[in-house]
């Protein structure tokens, strides 16, 4: 999904070079090999510029340079690295990342200027955090779910701040969340303030690498602090009592370990997933309850709106597909078209 797609032959050569490094780590170096120790396995816990922090098997963190032959390196990558030795002047030499293991998954986001950019690697699940304050937005949840389905990374929906609900409000929110439970998504109701519901969430995170996604103000950082036992400093986006707006903060993507087991990558790049780079067919596939009806419409070019003989529209009318989800599907398509129009207009100005 890179901006300049490699040919099959080029990709084979890149993969072959990486495999040689993984096996031997003895190709011609861009650093003096005498400065480094034996190759070891590690995981990237943060990346900045041409340096990365790599955690070794014993839990120590090492600042490393990155070989120029490595095309892409992000937080969560599993790597072969070598520790730096003590230089003659008594100065410790940084370690070096020699090669990157094949990724099981990669989280990406679109960028107007750089194409699709990787954010994190080897993610097992995306935790979609929403809240009743400043507003429970099913449209935002649906956007995240489309991104998860497109990336083929399992989502979990977490509704935070349930301590602010009375019985009537809880019943309404549960009715809204049943829309997602009924199509196979896992939904957890929690409060980072009272810590209600944290135990099931801890169990869902154990033994997996997760990334939390959510708009400013939903309590994502407060929730992470509660799960981490306040052992780490993750900036909190508090909600103003007057405006209801979250305070914007930015940090580098970093991997943390939960005390109960499992890891989380905290990244500012997943506040909101852009979908404008996707094709309409990918958005349609991102709504899992549509799958049984695709190909059953009267016309092959059906837009799944007011077209006669639309199987998806009929399923909505019969109550088999939630009308809210159907409406959000079209809102997403409309927003994509608007963004692409603005992008094309901007491109013509350059």
Swiss-Prot record:
Bias (Polar residues) occurs at: 1-17
Q: Which GO terms describe its molecular function?
A: GTP binding; GTPase activity; metal ion binding; rRNA binding
Q: What class of enzyme is it?
A: hydrolase
The yes or no answer to whether the keyword Transferase is present is no
For this UniProt record, give its keywords in alphabetical order, as a comma-separated list.
Cytoplasm, GTP-binding, Hydrolase, Metal-binding, Nucleotide-binding, Ribosome biogenesis, RNA-binding, rRNA-binding, Zinc
Cofactor(s) for this protein? Zn(2+)
Any coiled-coil regions, as ranges? none
Where along the chain is GTP bound? Answer: 160-163, 214-222
Q: Which biological process terms from the Gene Ontology are attached to this UniProt entry?
A: ribosomal small subunit biogenesis
One family name in Pfam for this protein: RsgA_GTPase
What residues does the CP-type G domain cover?
104-273
The record's listing under CDD domains reads: YjeQ_EngC (cd01854)
Q: How is the cofactor bound?
A: Binds 1 zinc ion per subunit.
InterPro entries given in the database record: G_CP_dom (IPR030378), NA-bd_OB-fold (IPR012340), P-loop_NTPase (IPR027417), Ribosome_biogen_GTPase_RsgA (IPR004881), RsgA_GTPase_dom (IPR010914)
Any idea which positions bind Zn(2+)?
Answer: 297, 302, 304, 310
UniProt xrefs under SUPFAM superfamilies: P-loop containing nucleoside triphosphate hydrolases (SSF52540)
State where the protein is found.
Cytoplasm
What EC number(s) would the UniProt record show? 3.6.1.-
List every stretch annotated Disordered: 1-33
Sorted alphabetically, the Gene Ontology cellular component annotations on this record are:
cytoplasm
Coarsely, its chief localization is cytoplasm
Could you describe the subunit structure of this protein? Monomer. Associates with 30S ribosomal subunit, binds 16S rRNA.
State the family it belongs to.
Belongs to the TRAFAC class YlqF/YawG GTPase family. RsgA subfamily.
According to its UniProt entry, the function of this protein is described as: One of several proteins that assist in the late maturation steps of the functional core of the 30S ribosomal subunit. Helps release RbfA from mature subunits. May play a role in the assembly of ribosomal proteins into the subunit. Circularly permuted GTPase that catalyzes slow GTP hydrolysis, GTPase activity is stimulated by the 30S ribosomal subunit.
Return the protein name: Small ribosomal subunit biogenesis GTPase RsgA
- Encoding gene, per UniProt annotation: rsgA
């Amino acid at each position: 999904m890179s901006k300049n797609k490699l040919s099959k032959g080029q990709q084979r050569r890149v993969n072959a070079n990486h495999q040689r490094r993984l096996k031997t780590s003895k190709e011609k170096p861009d650093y003096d090999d005498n400065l480094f120790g034996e190759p070891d396995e590690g995981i990237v816990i943060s990346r900045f510029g041409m340096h990365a922090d790599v955690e070794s098997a014993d839990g120590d963190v090492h600042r490393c340079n990155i070989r120029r032959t490595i095309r892409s390196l992000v937080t969560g990558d599993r790597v072969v690295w070598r520790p730096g030795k003590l230089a003659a002047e008594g100065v410790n030499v940084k370690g070096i990342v020699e090669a990157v293991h094949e990724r099981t998954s990669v989280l990406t986001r679109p960028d107007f200027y750089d194409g699709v950019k990787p954010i994190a690697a080897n993610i097992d699940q995306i935790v979609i955090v929403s809240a009743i304050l400043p507003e429970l937005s099913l449209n935002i949840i649906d956007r995240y779910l489309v991104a998860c389905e497109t990336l083929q990374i399992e989502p979990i929906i977490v509704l935070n701040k349930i301590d602010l609900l009375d019985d009537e409000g809880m019943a309404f929110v549960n009715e809204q969340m049943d829309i997602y439970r009924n199509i196979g998504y896992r939904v957890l109701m929690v409060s980072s303030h009272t810590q209600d519901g944290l135990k099931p969430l801890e169990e869902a995170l154990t033994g997996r690498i997760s990334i939390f996604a959510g708009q400013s103000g939903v309590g994502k950082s407060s929730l992470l602090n509660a799960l981490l036992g306040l052992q780490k400093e993750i900036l909190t986006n508090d909600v103003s009592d007057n405006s209801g707006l979250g305070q914007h903060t930015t940090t580098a993507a970093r991997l943390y370990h939960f005390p109960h087991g499992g890891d989380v990558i905290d990244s500012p790049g997943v506040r909101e997933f852009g979908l404008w780079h996707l094709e309409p067919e990918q958005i349609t596939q991102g709504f899992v309850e549509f799958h049984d009806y695709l190909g059953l419409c009267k016309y092959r070019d059906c837009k799944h709106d007011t077209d006669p003989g639309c199987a998806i529209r009929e399923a909505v009318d019969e109550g088999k597909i939630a009308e809210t989800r159907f409406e959000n599907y079209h809102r997403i398509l409309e927003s994509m078209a608007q963004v692409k129009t603005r992008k094309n207009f901007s491109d013509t100005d350059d």
